[in-house]
Amino acid sequence: MADKKTVTPEEKKLVAEKHVDELVQKALVALEEMRKLDQEQVDYIVAKASVAALDAHGELALHAFEETGRGVFEDKATKNLFACEHVVNNMRHTKTVGVIEEDDVTGLTLIAEPVGVVCGITPTTNPTSTAIFKSLISLKTRNPIVFAFHPSAQESSAHAARIVRDAAIAAGAPENCVQWITQPSMEATSALMNHEGVATILATGGNAMVKAAYSCGKPALGVGAGNVPAYVEKSANIRQAAHDIVMSKSFDNGMVCASEQAVIIDKEIYDEFVAEFKSYHTYFVNKKEKALLEEFCFGVKANSKNCAGAKLNADIVGKPATWIAEQAGFTVPEGTNILAAECKEVGENEPLTREKLSPVIAVLKSESREDGITKARQMVEFNGLGHSAAIHTADEELTKEFGKAVKAIRVICNSPSTFGGIGDVYNAFLPSLTLGCGSYGRNSVGDNVSAINLLNIKKVGRRRNNMQWMKLPSKTYFERDSIQYLQKCRDVERVMIVTDHAMVELGFLDRIIEQLDLRRNKVVYQIFADVEPDPDITTVNRGTEIMRAFKPDTIIALGGGSPMDAAKVMWLFYEQPEVDFRDLVQKFMDIRKRAFKFPLLGKKTKFIAIPTTSGTGSEVTPFAVISDKANNRKYPIADYSLTPTVAIVDPALVLTVPGFVAADTGMDVLTHATEAYVSQMASDYTDGLALQAIKLVFENLESSVKNADFHSREKMHNASTIAGMAFANAFLGISHSMAHKIGAQFHTIHGRTNAILLPYVIRYNGTRPAKTATWPKYNYYRADEKYQDIARMLGLPASTPEEGVESYAKAVYELGERIGIQMNFRDQGIDEKEWKEHSRKLAFLAYEDQCSPANPRLPMVDHMQEIIEDAYYGYKERPGRRK
């Protein structure tokens, strides 16, 4: 008789790979067929398949019990019921086909697609229920599944899969929607997991199998081992806790991975709990029996030299307590449900504190709450990271403390952990037989695995404009002598006036105090008159300290931009002392989504802004510019919480402003209005304000500077506030970005700096760019057209956008010259060499400035450096090139 041919490992591997490839190719065909199913068809298939499995739940449980020789028939039947009933009920109304969600407000549409062919790995512990579960969630998501069953449960697992498959096909599913490897082997399982046609791996099994799944270079939904503690704290319902733990631990002879592996009992209730535990046929082993149990279960004894090398004896998994005791070498009463072993600590020295997957449980005494939590934490971290932990207590706060302490995804409160872990019976966890352990357990999923995990959710995002706004002071008073409002303002008793020395010397401070003294109630006031031009953060801090000591209910900021800006930040520091200045100055793309959220102001004080120059518009804006002179930095701070409560725009306060000051501040107004009009955040609400402000400037600034008549001064005062209203909501651009940095370095006058830069910025922004700005509402470049609008309004040549840009830039330059401004930086007393040495740094700093993001074209550092260098000589001598 000829010798039987020996199959080599390589031949065995090739056979396995061929078989697997045939299965996967069939599954790929099924995938295309399943893509054609609609939601109604899918739900019908799942319903029919689940009913078929439900009808055979007892038959399948018996098959699994007989084939594996493990667990409890009745409990396996319950697990099959759970997979058919709870899982399907939970996903009954889940949309898994096509458009599953549509939101007209956000513009998002979600579309569900199958992930592809699923590789399903199942364990010997829950063979039929896991096969049912994975088949049903795959069908629900239109994914064909190919199983690699555990060899010791091959037939019962295939039996379960066959019932689901046949029912699904009868209901309209494609022929190969559910398949399995018929000749199980490690080679076949490896080939399936690594097959390029497999999209994802759904693995339930031992750590080695899960690790292998994650090593395949494709998405894997693998779950880790558990080592679940149950901490019974002294306030717990002892009868309930003992009942739950016994029921949970004995369920299917402890084979559910979420079952308790140790019970930790507070010393105050230890004896009472143990007595209750014993009443449910739990047998506590003695010292000798414990040693025998350790040796049989793990091959080592407690505190022996080789404890670290303990390995679970796979023969005990799912076996009855009586059988385990007998095999270990001792006898227990008939009907014993659980073997309990008292242990002194958690860890390698006590092998019975490891995961056992059998009706064997470690029992530990806790000396305190802290000790109980520590022991529970140690259990989870002893080869059970991320899985589950249970606590029995009446203390809700302790439950939260416990949840924070243990590295477990599932914290199960006052419930049996077997059913608490798999969900939907004792709590609202997702019903599942595959329990993710998150990053703690080196898993990609940190929840109970469900149908959602087998979907690719595509998002269709419709373009939408960001919601914009119009935020201004709640009240703005104007016209001559409108400071009389101070007599009538409500709830004014303690007033801090923030101003500068000029306001004191010119008598403006006295006029404010006079109005306060005319009130019916007596007003106590504190004066801080030390604000300097370009106020420094140290000045702000000094004013804040005085404010904290005085405790005002009203702040009045009197003066130009400097007192108003300083007062705003004092207001912020006074009401919110914990705020860090460094947080305030951070740049943002969208003021509503900034990394640092400004706190709301106005709880302690109201803020009244009274401008005495016509330039900054700070009385109506959410901005403040604060210097850090020690580091030559100037920071524009922006947040709507800084918007004054009330603005009083009284033209009588600007009649004595010197002409050169009116010139500088007037050009600042023009820059505000121009930059707001072309800003990418400009809107219909701000455009009208900006255009009116520009019109008022060109009609009145020259007369305001040269004649100082009431009419022109009033119009310029109004223009300043109107421009402020516009740029408070549309923001500014790079003229201000560069002006802030130049002013900080060379201490130039802010309005004059803007006047010199503005013609350059108009030409720069008016040139169609290569790199455009980013803002949804700004859907195409149009700054050149908006400059053309301005030129037309002013009656300038503007037959084309290019002509309008050039006309307007020239008009701005000529206006500056007419009012006496030397329109270059050379004539501001700045050394040419020093200017050029700093130009690069100033350009970088300007790019970082908060005004840059709203510029209508993306500002490039090289371009701003060129503008800065050209502006030294002035627009007339070196107008710069259009970039």
UniProtKB/Swiss-Prot annotation:
Task: Quickly give the catalysed reaction.
Answer: ethanol + NAD(+) = acetaldehyde + NADH + H(+); an aldehyde + NAD(+) + H2O = a carboxylate + NADH + 2 H(+)
Q: Which PROSITE patterns match?
A: ADH_IRON_1, ADH_IRON_2
Q: What EC number(s) does its UniProt record assign? A: 1.1.1.1, 1.2.1.3
Aldehyde dehydrogenase: region residues: 13-456
- Domain of life here? Bacteria
**What are the positions of the active site?**
C257 (nucleophile)
* TM helices/strands, residue ranges: none
Entry binding sites for NAD(+) 2: D500, D534, G561, S562, P563, M564, D565, T612, T613, V625, K634, L653
GO MF annotation: an example: ethanol dehydrogenase (NAD+) activity
Task: Tell me the residue numbers annotated for binding NAD(+).
Answer: G438, S439, Y440, G441, R442, N443
Q: Which Pfam families match?
A: ADH_Fe_C, Aldedh, Fe-ADH
| Keyword Secreted in annotation | no
Gene Ontology terms describing biological process: alcohol metabolic process; carbon utilization
Briefly explain the null phenotype.
Reduction of 29.3%, in total NAD(H) pool, and 11.1% increase in the NAD+/NADH ratio. Significant, but modest, reduction in the ATP pool, and extends lag phase during growth. Increases susceptibility to gentamicin, but not erythromycin, chloramphenicol, rifampicin, penicillin and vancomycin. Reduces production of the bacterial capsule. Simultaneous disruption of alcohol dehydrogense adh resulted in similar growth rate, ATP level, and survival rate after erythromycin exposure.
Q: Please describe what this protein does.
A: Has alcohol dehydrogenase activity. Has aldehyde dehydrogenase activity. May play a role in enhancing virulence in mice. May be considered a potential virulence factor.
What family name appears in the similarity comment? In the N-terminal section; belongs to the aldehyde dehydrogenase family.
Any idea what this protein is called? Answer: Aldehyde-alcohol dehydrogenase
Q: Which organism is it from?
A: Streptococcus pneumoniae serotype 4 (strain ATCC BAA-334 / TIGR4)
Q: Gene behind this chain?
A: adhE
